[in-house]
Every structure is written in C-alpha cells, then in structure tokens.
Amino acid sequence: TSASNLAFSKPAYPYGTDHGYGLRSEIGTATFPTFESIREFIPKEDWWPLPTDEQLKNDPNTVWNKHFFGKEAWNAKPIDYKKAVNEQFGESDSLEEFCEKAQLLNMEVVKGMYEAWNDKMWNDASGLLLWMSHPAYPSFVWQTYDYYYDPTGAYWGAKKACEHLHIQWNASNNSIKVINTTAKDLRRVCAKAVVYNLNGKEVSDCSRIKWLDVSAGNIAEAFV
C-alpha cells in the first residue's frame, strides 16, 4: 500500500507536475541518519535543540552545517525538512525522537519519487537514478544508507516503491494504480483499497475491490 507522494506539498510533488520526468540521472533529498549514527559525529552538547531557522539559513559555523544540515546544503532545504518532520509527525523533545520521526519522512519522500515515475511509466518517465546511495562523509543529505552503513528510511522507501509488484496512490488525483515491473503478464489480480477512520476502524462503505490484468513492465489503473 502507499501513503506518501509528498501530499503535504502544494501542489503535491512530484505528482503535481506533468513534465520534466524522462530519465532522471541525478535526484536526491535531505536525509537524516538514525540517532545511533548521528551520535557518532555530532558532539553531545550540540544534540538539542536543533539549529534555529536563522542558523540553518545563515550560520556557517555550526557543527550541523559542517555535515550539510545548514547553508552548505541550501539546495536540500534544511528549514523545510525540519518543518515537514514537525508538522507531519509532531514536535519533538529530543534529538532521538526527531531522528525517529525523520525516518518516516525519509521513507515517504523517496518512495514518493519512485512512485511518481511508476505512475507515468513510459509516458515521459523511463527511469530514475538517485544521487546518491552512500556518502563519503557523515552527512544529512543524499543517502539511502549512511556513512556507517546504517539504512535510513530512504532505503526502505526506495525498496518498497521498487518492489516487482506494487500498488500505489496518486496524491494529485487520488487514483490507485497497480505497477508490474516483472517480465510476466499478470491476469486477474486483485487490487483492494481499504479506508480507515482515525480510530483505526475500517470504513467498509469506502473500501473497494477490483480484479484486473496488468501487462509485463507496465501499469494498470484500479480506482480513481
């Protein structure tokens, strides 16, 4: 199932655009490592609180900036990253708590990128390569697993979106599509969409099932 695609952005990105897909050879995001890794390279006295927005924008001397969470990595938008974690998953009281929540954002962002290309497979979307998988220096950007080889949420997001048979939601138009990246045609497979309320109870009137065929290396729309 899917619930990513950066739906919090206005418009939802990357689903909110209809151009610029093609074969992207270099794309990446800010990516917080796990707390276990961060404590290896950020001194304990600097753990908390995180740098202010003003520091992230202008201060070149923080230890965070030296590891690309600050003005040195302006193109990774550290202020927006911090804001997204806080707004989507709640304010944190410690670095450890923030790191745990950041992994959820890491997963959603990278899963959303791959799902956007899935959604337009062979329609101005032929491939996506991440920059990059692994940093040569302890860092807060461009990685799926960190300097210490610990996977971040970005790794698991990419793995989920790139599974051979995948079902996903488009945040821009609410369509549900089945993605088949295998070399085998699939006949009469079942797509099921389940809606839950805020108490975790299934809303049966809103749930749907559809049987469909999906050609090899292609996509099929299940619901809109």
Regions found by a protein language model. Name each.
Residues 9-187:
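Substrate-binding clefts and catalytic carboxylate motifs of secreted carbohydrate-active enzymes
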Residues 189-224:
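Intrinsically disordered, low-complexity Pro/Gly/Ser/Thr-rich segments with frequent PxxP/GP/PP motifs
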